[in-house]
A protein has these predicted regions:
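Alpha-helical subdomain
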Residues: 1-168
Length: 168
């Protein structure tokens, strides 16, 4: 969801040869993704769907086995993120998994430091900010998810973490 130029999609497809992937994003982004993937990874295009989806409007396509969101929740306010978690839950097949990659902050919203500084920028440019694991896991529980866990990514190079949640 919000697959951008397809960077993560290509790596997922490379890692799992039997996987069929999809990018759900806005029309302009899909045009860029298709151009880049046709040039650099045409094999990935054959194993992927490209669908125009505005996650802020309407339901998400489904059922799907997994949803990967990278750097989306920090652009939205709490109410929009709660709604997005509910949409993801409805789009997932039973036993599906949601993976959220973003700056996931500590309870005091002070670490990681890069996320705290980025939140200042977000407050000026979006409706969002970086959220704590407690906040994100609360939205996920409200939406019906379980087995919610935080998986930090190696730092450096990453300043992000992943939150994983299951639909049972």
């Amino acid at each position: 969801l919000g697959g951008g130029p397809g960077t993560y999609l290509v790596e997922f497809l490379r890692r799992w040869p039997g996987l069929h992937g999809a990018i759900y994003d806005l029309p302009a982004t899909l045009r860029v993704a298709r151009r880049i993937l046709n040039e650099r990874a045409p094999w990935a295009v054959a194993r992927s769907d490209f669908r125009e989806v505005d996650y802020t409007a309407g339901e998400l396509p489904g059922p799907v086995d997994a949803i990967f969101m990278s750097n989306i929740i920090h652009s939205e306010d709490e109410a929009a993120n709660r709604g997005l978690m509910r949409k993801c839950f409805r789009a997932l097949a039973p036993h599906g998994i949601l993976v959220i990659k973003d700056h996931i902050m500590n309870a005091g919203l002070t670490e990681p430091a890069a996320g705290a500084v980025f939140s200042l920028y977000l407050l000026l440019t979006t409706r969002g900010r970086d959220y704590s694991f407690e906040e994100v896991s609360g939205w996920l529980r409200e939406a019906g998810f379980s087995d919610i866990r935080l998986e930090p990514l190696p730092s450096p190079p990453f300043t992000s973490s992943m939150v994983l949640a299951r639909k049972f």
